Amino acid sequence: MALLALILGNGFDIDMGLPSKYSDFVQSPEYKDFEDRMHKMYYKEELGKSLILHLQNAYAKSNWFDIEEEIHKYVVTNKGFDDRMIRLIRSEFNELKKALVNYLKRITNNFTANKEKLSTYLLYRLRECPLAATEIYFNYTNPNEYLKLPLQKEIFNGAQHWFTYVHGSLREDDIVLGCDLQEGENVNRQLSFMYKYNQLNKANHVARSILEAKEIIFFGHSINEMDFCYFKEFFKAASASPNPIRHLTIITYDEESERNIKDNIRNQGISVTDLYNNLWTLEFIHTQKVYEKDEIEIKKWNTLILRLLTKDRQGI
């Protein structure tokens, strides 16, 4: 059983220096090539119902957008396709995934992580942690490769260490991209290949790993609705237990992203106030302020690192 769970989202890669935002991807040569090929694949009268046109329109409205959120909107609002359109959309969706994989492989090829970044420093220090730990990746990249760190189950400082890639990885050349069925929605069977659960093919025990951990760290993950199924039991238990046995640290960019995360948690029926009442500690660390040498944020960061390196401490 891992006593420490580190949950990593795309913000972790961004902190490390990778241009891995979806808005970066849609400006890439890989996406432009995908876009051109998809336009040629459809008849003119079919293009209006295509996924590529939906993504184009969404990006035109905002330079920042989430492809998976747009896929969800597309699945919810588009039905009644004939067999030909379903085949074309399936092909289009598969080509989108290939384009994303090719883009991420290109930008990670020979990438050197900035060792002064918090993300990099955290992974190095985690190897000195005396607690059994699990790293849970919601992104597709393998930062351990940039840092020349092991990728499989290992023993560090006498403690076991596990790695889980929830949505696949570039190393496996297989990624999970799409959306999940939200509460109250009906399955769109014509486009069900876009649901993430239909792309999963092995158990990962993520929910149990987080629930069992006593030290939980989110870095660069928005704790959004799409992924909340993995966190729900943990947050329910953490907000309800009168025995404060857990430390929760959420590392995010700034105050606005902190508010968004709190709103996301509250929207899932979890009281943020109860989390503050029932966790041993709940801290938000803003990377922007740490880099700006803010004394309060630096103190919170140093307290976290010290706790990671200490075997006997409160709450564990």
What function would you assign to each model-found segment?
Residues L6-G9, R127-E128, Q190-L200, E215-F218:
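Generic preference for well-ordered secondary structure
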Residues M1-M16, Q152-K153, H205-I316:
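SIR2/sirtuin-family catalytic core signature
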Residues A2-I7, M16-G168, A207-E212, E225, ...:
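Active-site periphery "cap/insert" segments of enzyme catalytic domains
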Residues Y103-K115, V187-Y197, H221:
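Surface-exposed cleft-lining segments at the edges of enzyme active sites
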